[in-house]
């Protein structure tokens, strides 16, 4: 294994350990020492890979983008097929509802309010998600030969807001034990718009 491969594997290990710490303690309660200990590396080694906690948080934004990439690729490949766009929405909702993802979403939102660099990195992911969904929604309308009730960008924003707000409620612990209060897949289908 080459040195570059080992460095990349170590960075992945550090990032996974940091994510576990962030989910358990939050960004501000997690120290670089906590991350080094969780990753099983020395503090010096950690600083060789990441100059500080903000760099790790920015790497989380890159990891989020990479995790979303396959979903977005499938959405692009849907070519306006309503059922496939609905599958994307359900898959994205399932991803956002994962406990770790939901808890991290709360942390990201709070950190984004305080740190413009973090806000910019995660906003880029959101813009990509919204733009890709808007394009798919436009194709759905064209395929079904209908005029959308909302502009595709606004419709995409409403759909993503519904999904992400459900995840934030979970991350805040407001939705524990209330599966009935969860975002209904039927609502996503309704927000997707009527067929022609």
Where are these regions (language model features)?
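N-terminal intrinsically disordered/low-complexity leader segments
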Residues: 1-9, 20, 141, 196
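Short alpha-helical elements of helix-turn-helix
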Residues: 11-12, 16, 103-106
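Helix-turn-helix
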Residues: 13, 17-55, 59
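Short alpha-helical functional segments enriched in proximate histidine and acidic residues
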Residues: 21, 67, 95, 132, ...
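Amphipathic, non-transmembrane alpha-helical scaffold segments
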Residues: 57, 61, 65, 119-130
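Hydrophobic alpha-helical connector segments
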Residues: 59-62, 72-102, 152-159
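Amphipathic alpha-helical segments used for helix-helix packing
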Residues: 84, 96-120
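Hydrophobic/aromatic-rich alpha-helical bundle segments in the mid-to-C-terminal region
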Residues: 119-123, 127, 141-191
């Amino acid at each position: 294994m080459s040195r570059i491969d080992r460095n990349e594997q170590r960075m992945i290990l550090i990032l996974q350990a940091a994510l576990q710490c962030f989910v358990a303690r939050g960004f501000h309660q997690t120290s670089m020492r906590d991350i080094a200990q969780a990753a099983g590396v020395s503090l010096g080694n950690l600083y060789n890979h990441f100059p500080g906690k903000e760099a790790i948080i920015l790497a989380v934004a890159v990891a989020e983008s990479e995790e979303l990439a396959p979903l977005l690729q499938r959405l692009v490949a849907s070519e306006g097929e309503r059922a496939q766009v609905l599958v994307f929405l359900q898959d994205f909702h399932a991803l956002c509802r994962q406990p770790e993802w939901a808890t991290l979403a709360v942390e990201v939102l709070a950190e984004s309010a305080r740190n413009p660099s973090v806000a910019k990195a995660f906003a880029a992911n959101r813009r990509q998600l919204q733009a890709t969904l808007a394009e798919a929604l436009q194709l759905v309308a064209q395929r079904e030969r209908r005029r959308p009730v909302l502009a595709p960008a606004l419709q995409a924003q409403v759909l993503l807001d519904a999904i992400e707000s459900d995840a934030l409620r979970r991350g805040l612990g407001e939705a524990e034990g209330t599966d009935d209060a969860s975002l209904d897949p039927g609502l996503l289908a309704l927000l997707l718009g009527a067929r022609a």
